Design a protein with these regions (language model features):
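Short active-site loop at a secondary-structure junction
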Residues: 1-57, 90-103, 174-177
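Short, surface-exposed loop or secondary-structure junction motifs
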Residues: 46-185
Length: 185
């Protein structure tokens, strides 16, 4: 139905980048100021990248980091992921190529949290869902499965049998992939 909730996955990134754009418009952030100038504890594996990395680099997927998706799925919280960033070896030189990266988008959400003192989830709800009338959208798999109508995932096994599977919970990686919505919203 038009109200059936489903994970919009990486389309969540557009919501995160919109929150960042709002913070830039409010003068709280600048696309081209190195992250380390806002947060002295910001550290990447590469010293040059640490000194030069900006929101524009992060939003454009040009940090040189490989996706490291298992890291944001298995990490306890975003602040722990922030600390672990310094140990991730780059896959390419900084700004040399575009490497799609959920981990970096998760950290972009953490930057918004650190700047505002609000959770990313609350920022999305208050600044986007509420003003846009998105009453059937949320930021958590746990919330989605409580909804009266949500898409149930299935998987076809190697044996050809289709089976119901659990909803994948990627709440930690929310800024990259955890928004659930519906056609109506």
């Amino acid at each position: 139905t038009p109200k059936t909730q489903y994970g919009i996955a990486s389309c969540s990134k557009s919501f995160t980048s919109t929150i960042i754009a709002m913070l830039v418009d409010e003068g709280k952030l600048d696309y081209d100021v190195p992250i380390i100038e806002y947060f002295p504890d910001f550290k990447m594996y590469d010293e040059f990248a640490t000194k030069e990395c900006t929101l524009r680099d992060m939003l454009s997927h040009r940090t040189g980091l490989a996706p490291h998706d298992a890291l944001w799925i298995d990490t306890i919280d975003r602040s722990t992921l922030w600390e672990r960033l310094r140990y991730l070896k780059p896959m390419a030189p900084f700004r040399a190529q575009t490497l799609y990266n959920n981990t970096i988008y998760t950290l972009i959400g953490h930057i918004a949290e650190k700047i505002t003192g609000q959770t990313w989830d609350d920022l999305i709800k208050e600044r986007l869902f509420k003003p846009l009338g998105m009453t059937n959208s949320n930021t958590s798999a746990d919330d989605m499965v409580k909804a009266p109508d949500y898409a149930i995932p299935y998987w076809e096994g190697k044996d050809g049998i289709v089976r119901k599977v659990d909803v994948l919970n990627v709440d930690l990686g929310g800024p990259a992939a955890s928004i659930n919505s519906c056609v109506e919203d």
